[in-house]
Structure formats: structure tokens, C-alpha cells
Amino acid sequence: MNAPLSPKARDAYRLWQLCFGDTDAFLSSYFSEVYRDDCTLIGYTEGEATTHLQYLPVELSSAGERLRVSYVVAVCTHPDYAGRGLMKEELKTALILSQERGDVASLLLPAEDWLFDYYTKAVGYAPIPVAVTTTSLEAVLSESDPECEGVTLVEYLTAVERASKAPQLLHTPAIWRVVTEDYPTSEGYVLREHRTAEDKVNGALFYVEREDEVIVQAVYGSSAVREVLLQEPSHSAKKVSYYLRPEGGRGVGEERRGMIRLLDPLRFLQHLATLHPDLRGAWAYSDELFPALDGLYIVEGGVVRRTAYPTSHAYPKCRTTAELFAQLGKSLGEELSYSLRLFFEAV
């Protein structure tokens, strides 16, 4: 039996359901497994809960290197109070609290296209590739995962993500439990497991069947396991689309984008320098929300250091995450990207 919700959680639950229409079954699972009062912001207007967001503590992983980050979910304003500019201050507060918690960056998936511009202008988020949509089955089969097994589906999914060297946002076991419980309960949403002869899970498939299209949102497993799992959707008479991780899907389909906002550029750059020892550069970085981060960031020989903000114009000026990412993309020869899927986003 679920523990009673706190007054704050009850307000969060009601506002989430009012704005997004999610079922009691999903919300009960989410609020039991994932929700935390200390990761939730609710704004009140004359005693009425009017704004809501949650900034979940998760990890960003690349080649086994991990960074603490926040993932922002369920950003919403009560319909009767929309258009009053209430959310901007809540987003700023979430970023400040995330930084105080030790998060290196904040990520989110805008629910609608117009929100990309809003999040950029409001608090400095930058768009990044999080997936590529393709119709190429060959491309999906070439994107294999490490060999992993789990007694349960959640155990397998947690293990295979952490074994992968792909740049990605990692699910916690609690988030995986909510995702795997809820996914097959929605109309047209299908979840399949692949098991070994010893009845261990070693693959999983998530896809959505629509009236005129099948969308494979995620598939996990070796190439051989993927081939077995994908037989069902690939034989459909409908158009079949597949989501690939962005770094492996370049040039084979249409990019899907999420957003990222740096909170600690020094630690983020050190993360990149560890992964890319040949990365070199110096950038004059400034941050309107976090002026203490202003400075000249120098990367060389796998080491990052920060000095005082330069008075000369000899260095590229980066006033936002987007501008710094553009400079890093030039230095690395490719755009930075992180796989982000099955985090409660709409398909």
C-alpha cells in the first residue's frame, strides 16, 4: 500500500493531472517510486497551486564517465493562470537549487516546439540532439548494446545502460520501474522482452503502434537479439520508424532535440577533456544567472583551468550554453549530443 502523500505532493499530483491528463495509475506509480518533496517546486497565487516542476537527480554518462545532472519534468502552469510569466522565476529557482545540489547541468525535453525558444530566452537552455528518427532497419541493427543479462526487466535495463559507452542520460531503477509499468498500459504502446535459455532478460523493445505508422522508441540488446525483437514491428504493413542514439544516427534520419543548461562549466569541460584528451581551446564564458562562473576557461592536455574573465577580445565570447557548445562543436569536429529517451516524453 502506498504511503500517504504529503500536502506538497498532493498539490503536485493535482496540478500535474490537471495540466497533462495522466492517469491515476501512472501518477500513483510515479509519486510512489520517483517523487520527492525536495526536488519539487510549486508556486502559489492567493493560496492556489499555480505552477509546478520537478528537477530529478540523475546522471549523464559517456564512455563510463558520469556527471550528476538534473532532469526537469512536468513543467506546467494552471490553465487559469497561464500567460502571466509565473514560470520563469520557478525555472530560475530550479537551476539555482540544482547547482547548490552539485548538479553539473540541467536537461529537459520540451513538450512542444515553441517551448524551445521559451526555455532559451527564459533561462538559457540550449538545444542538443537526443535521438535520430530513421526508417533504416539496418541502422538500428548496427547500433548494438553490450551483452548484459538481468533477472528482471528493470535489472537488465539498468545494467545495459550503465555498461554502454554511448553518451546518454541514465535512468534510475525507480524511473525504469515506472516506465516499464506504465508503458504497456497506454493504448498502442507495446513492450517486449527477450530472454535467454536460462530465462534471464537480455533485450527489450518499446514501440508505439498508430493508425498509419509504427514508431520503435527504443530497442536494447545485441545485434542478434535486436533482430529477433524487431521482427514483429518490422513486418508491419505500416510505415516503421526507429529512434537511434544521436551519435550513431548522424546522416541517416531526422534529428530529435532536447535541451541542456550548464550549471558548472568547469566540471563539464573537465568531463569532455577526459574523454577527448586532444581537445584544446580557451573561451571567455559569462553567465547572467550565475556570474560567479564568469571567467576564461582553458582546456589543454586533458586539463581544464579557469582564470579571471579576460579584458582583451582575443578569445571567443560565450554568454550562453548554446554559444559554448557551438565552440566546443568546432573544436571536437562534431556537435555534442546525448541520448535521452523513455523519460515520460510524448511520442
Task: Go through the PLM ranges and name each one.
Residues L41, L56-E59, V73, E112-W114, ...:
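Core nucleotidyl-transferase/polymerase catalytic module
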Residues L67-P79, D212-S223:
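Conserved acetyl-CoA binding element of GNAT-fold acetyltransferases
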Residues V72-T77, G83-S98, S223-S234:
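Conserved acetyl-CoA-binding loop-helix of GNAT-fold acetyltransferases
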Residues L91, S98-A111, S236-P246:
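Conserved GNAT acetyl-CoA-binding A-motif
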Residues A126-P233, R245-R250, L262-A284:
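Amide-forming acyltransferase catalytic core, primarily the GNAT-like/NAT-type
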Residues G253-V347:
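C-terminal functional modules
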